[in-house]
């Protein structure tokens, strides 16, 4: 299982780390690090066949530091995701499930 920060310690609008590798059946937990509103959105074109992008996404904002969201990944492959309000700033991430 892996934890990803929403926002760097420096305040940068990034997922930290932006790329993680896990085994099938493991969980990724995103934690709001900086107090900016962030969410986690998976694009249906950026997930493996058979994975449910909508079910993995957390479109409601995590506003306060320490707020978190977890998702379990059962299907092997590469998952691309982004933060909706900060996508233009390059706030994107990748999860590789083995």
UniProtKB/Swiss-Prot annotation:
It comes from the Eukaryota. GO terms for cellular component: chloroplast thylakoid lumen; chloroplast thylakoid membrane. Its cofactor is Cu(2+). Keywords: Chloroplast, Copper, Electron transport, Membrane, Metal-binding, Plastid, Thylakoid, Transport. Residues 1-98 form the Plastocyanin-like domain. InterPro entries: BlueCu_1, BlueCu_1_BS, Copper_blue_Plastocyanin, Cupredoxin, Plastocyanin. It is a peripheral membrane protein. Cu cation binds at residues 38, 83, 86, 91. It is found in: Plastid, Chloroplast thylakoid membrane. GO terms for molecular function: copper ion binding; electron transporter, transferring electrons from cytochrome b6/f complex of photosystem II activity. Participates in electron transfer between P700 and the cytochrome b6-f complex in photosystem I. This is Plastocyanin. It comes from Scenedesmus fuscus (Green alga). The gene is petE.
């Amino acid at each position: 299982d892996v934890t990803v920060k929403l926002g760097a310690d420096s305040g940068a609008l990034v997922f930290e780390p932006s790329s993680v590798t896990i085994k099938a059946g493991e969980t990724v937990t995103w934690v709001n690090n900086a107090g900016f509103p962030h969410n986690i959105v998976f694009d249906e074109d950026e997930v493996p066949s058979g994975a449910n992008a909508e079910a993995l996404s957390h479109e409601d904002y995590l506003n306060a530091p320490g707020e978190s969201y977890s998702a379990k990944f059962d299907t092997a492959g590469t998952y691309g995701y982004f933060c909706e309000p900060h996508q233009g700033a390059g706030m994107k991430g990748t999860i590789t499930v083995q």
